[in-house]
Amino acid sequence: MNFREERYDTIMFTDSHCPRVVADFFYEVESRFTTASSKVDGRLIGANPSGEGEDDEDVDDTSERVIDLVHANGFISVPYDLKSYKAQLKSYLKAIKERLQKTVPDKLPLLESQVNKYRKDVFANFDQYECFTGPSTNPEAMVVLMNFVCGR
């Protein structure tokens, strides 16, 4: 199942990352470090190096340690400070509230109360988060906050 940022129809994550709903409106998603390789496995494209007399040892294989969620979805790290993140969040929430007003207006009071609680914690610990946008890099789209939690 894909989870989308609805305003810009961007896939943010899938259920393979074990999402869970927090405070009725937010998702926390598990992610891990993994190694990504640039080496192309010729067998996946129909090549048979040993049968064709080719030696694939000359192929340059660069690998890097990546966060699986970031790598799989093309997220781009964005250097927000707290002030600029607050401004972005205010703009994003305004658009979300307008959408809810049209679709499910009875959820607005709950959204506002949960957002106020959730953002207090985020703002208090903002220096522990890394910010990402989706591959569209649209400045009005959702910002993904990543915080590493030990023991989960």
Curated annotation (Swiss-Prot):
Similarity field: Belongs to the TCTP family.
Subcellular locations according to the entry: Cytoplasm
Database matches in Pfam families: TCTP
Keyword Cell division: no
Keyword vocabulary terms for this entry: Calcium, Cytoplasm
Residue ranges occupied by any TCTP domain in the UniProt entry: 1-152
Principal location class: cytoplasm
Entry-linked SUPFAM superfamilies: Mss4-like
Primary role: Involved in calcium binding and microtubule stabilization.
Gene3D superfamilies: Metal Binding Protein, Guanine Nucleotide Exchange Factor, Chain A
A single GO molecular function term of this UniProt record: calcium ion binding
GO cellular component: cytoplasm
InterPro entries: Mss4-like_sf (IPR011057), Mss4/transl-control_tumour (IPR011323), TCTP (IPR034737), Translation_control_tumour_CS (IPR018103), Translational_control_tumour_p (IPR018105)
The protein, known as: Translationally-controlled tumor protein homolog
Protein's UniProt keywords contain Calcium: yes
Superkingdom assignment: Eukaryota
Bridged cysteine pairs (disulfide): none
